[in-house]
Every structure is written in structure tokens, then in C-alpha cells.
């Protein structure tokens, strides 16, 4: 028997809820306020079937462009034929949560401003670029027991 090509195909683990989180949605999910221009993460709740986005958008971050009483309009960028296309989705509130993108970005900006201010006081130029992790420096490995060479050699017949 061939496999189906349904709308929710291959989402058994993707939409599964974590251990001890099954059941109804918490009330705080509904009481969260969203404003136009905020960043949100689309996280599909498998127990709520209405207003569920397509599986490709699970885990994506988007920008709110419309707020309705029970759903939110989100702009998500998707790659189609090698170019980014702006997709506008209407997702129910159960499948959306506030994103930490702005908080992480603002923390980085504050750290960069502080580093620049300290560099100006010291008269040095500070690079604020994010560099990948550098390789570790060379270290000489020593054994736990110091090896002693034999002092007397004799022929073995």
C-alpha cells in the first residue's frame, strides 16, 4: 500500500507534545497580547487542529502584520525556486508564542556599545563582529606516570 500525501504527512514527531504537557492549552497562551510589528515563533500545537499552519512553518520566526480576535497574521520568508518569498499566514493564537529575537539583539547592541565606550576611553579600536570559535591552542600532553628508561642493557640470546 502506498503512503499518503496528506496535509499533515510525516508530522508524527514534529507535532507531538512533550511528556506531561498533553491536554488543554494553558490560559496564559490566550491572554498574551500581540501587537503589529512584533516577532513571534510559530510552534504548532498538535492538540489544537483549527488554525494550524503547514508543517514547513513549524519553528519559523515571523513578524505580526494583523491581529484578529482569535488569530494572528504573520509574515514569514520562505525559499521558493532559489529566492525568498514573503508568505502571509493567519495562525490561531494556540500555535504562536512571543519570540526572543529582539531581546537577544538588544543585549548584543548594549554589549557592543559598552565595548566601544571602553575602547574609546582606552584609545583603542574595538571590533564588534561576531567571530566563529577559534581552534584551541596547542597543549603538550603528559602521562600520569613518568616513564623511566632502563639503565642497564644486556644482550638477549
From Swiss-Prot:
One GO term in the molecular function aspect is: structural constituent of ribosome
InterPro entries linked to this entry: Ribosomal_eL21, Ribosomal_eL21_CS, Ribosomal_eL21_sf, Translation_prot_SH3-like_sf
Q: Which UniProt keywords apply?
A: Ribonucleoprotein, Ribosomal protein
Q: Which PROSITE patterns match?
A: RIBOSOMAL_L21E
Keyword Zinc-finger assigned to the entry: answer is no
SUPFAM superfamilies, from UniProt? Translation proteins SH3-like domain
Positions of the UniProt region annotated as Disordered: 110-132
Question: Which Gene3D superfamilies does the entry link to?
Answer: 6.10.250.3260, Ribosomal protein L21 (2.30.30.70)
What does UniProt give as GO cellular component? ribonucleoprotein complex; ribosome
Q: Which Pfam families match?
A: Ribosomal_L21e
The answer to whether UniProt assigns keyword Ribonucleoprotein to this entry is yes
**Domain of life per record:** Eukaryota
Example of a GO biological process term: translation
As for family, the record states: Belongs to the eukaryotic ribosomal protein eL21 family.
Q: Which PANTHER family match?
A: 60S RIBOSOMAL PROTEIN L21
Q: What name goes with this protein?
A: Large ribosomal subunit protein eL21
Amino acid at each position: 500500500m502506498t503512503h499518503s500525501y496528506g496535509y499533515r504527512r510525516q508530522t508524527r514527531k514534529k507535532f507531538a507534545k512533550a511528556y506531561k504537557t498533553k491536554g488543554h492549552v494553558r490560559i496564559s497562551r490566550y491572554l498574551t497580547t500581540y501587537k503589529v510589528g512584533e516577532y513571534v515563533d510559530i510552534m504548532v500545537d498538535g492538540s489544537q487542529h483549527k488554525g494550524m499552519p503547514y508543517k514547513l512553518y513549524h519553528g519559523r520566526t515571523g513578524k505580526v502584520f494583523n491581529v484578529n480576535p482569535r488569530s494572528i497574521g504573520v509574515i514569514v520568508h520562505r525559499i521558493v525556486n532559489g529566492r525568498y518569498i514573503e508568505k502571509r499566514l493567519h495562525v490561531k493564537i494556540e500555535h504562536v508564542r512571543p519570540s526572543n529575537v529582539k531581546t537577544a539583539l538588544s543585549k548584543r547592541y548594549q554589549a557592543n556599545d559598552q565595548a566601544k565606550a571602553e575602547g574609546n576611553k582606552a584609545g583603542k579600536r574595538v571590533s564588534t563582529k561576531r567571530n566563529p570559535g577559534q581552534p584551541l591552542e596547542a597543549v603538550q600532553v603528559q602521562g600520569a606516570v613518568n616513564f623511566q628508561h632502563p639503565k642497564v642493557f644486556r644482550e638477549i640470546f
